[in-house]
Amino acid sequence: NEELESIWDSIEHSMDGDASHFWVAESDVVDALVRIALHRPQLPKSIDIAGRRRWSTQQTHHELQMLYDRTRAGSTGQFTASLLDQPASPKISVVPIDAAQQDMRPSLGALHNVLVECDGHGWQPTSPLRTAMMVYLAGKLND
């Protein structure tokens, strides 16, 4: 799939040591937006939506690479046990707390409060990032 190869190349070329992201699954975002649309609460001027956990570019790359390799192997019939014999993801390491090096997660307070007002449940993303990445890859392969 040329589009996936292009995305993959851009990820590999943009890997710098300090970049990080607070990924969240599309399904969790859609769920929050539908809850807001159904209940029509009073909204603040802006609402940030983000995942709870910080993912470095390297962790994201590692996870996508593993899933992509498995997907390609499965689609070509060349699936081996070695593709399943990988450590659990993500590769998490202890990072010293240094405000200069840490990206600040967007505040989820406004989103949480609006969702509590809607139905009492607040912001509770339920989809693991690995699942969201698999859905993304499947969609790209089916395009």
Model-predicted regions and their roles:
Residues A25, S82-D85, V114:
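Helix N-cap / beta->alpha transition motif
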Residues M104-L115:
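Donor nucleotide-activated moiety binding/catalytic core segment of transferases
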Residues G17-H21, D48-R52, G120:
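Conserved short-loop catalytic and cofactor-binding motifs
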Residues A99-A100, E117-G120:
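Extended, small-residue-rich solenoid/repeat segments and analogous flexible loops
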Residues A25, W55-S56, S107:
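A diffuse structural propensity rather than consistent per-protein peaks
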Residues A32-D103, P125-D143:
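Mid/C-terminal beta-alpha module of Rossmann-like enzyme folds, strongest
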Residues N1-R35, L64:
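NAD(P)-dependent short-chain dehydrogenase/reductase
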Residues P106, G120-H121:
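Catalytic cores of transferase enzymes with a strong primary signal for eukaryotic protein kinases
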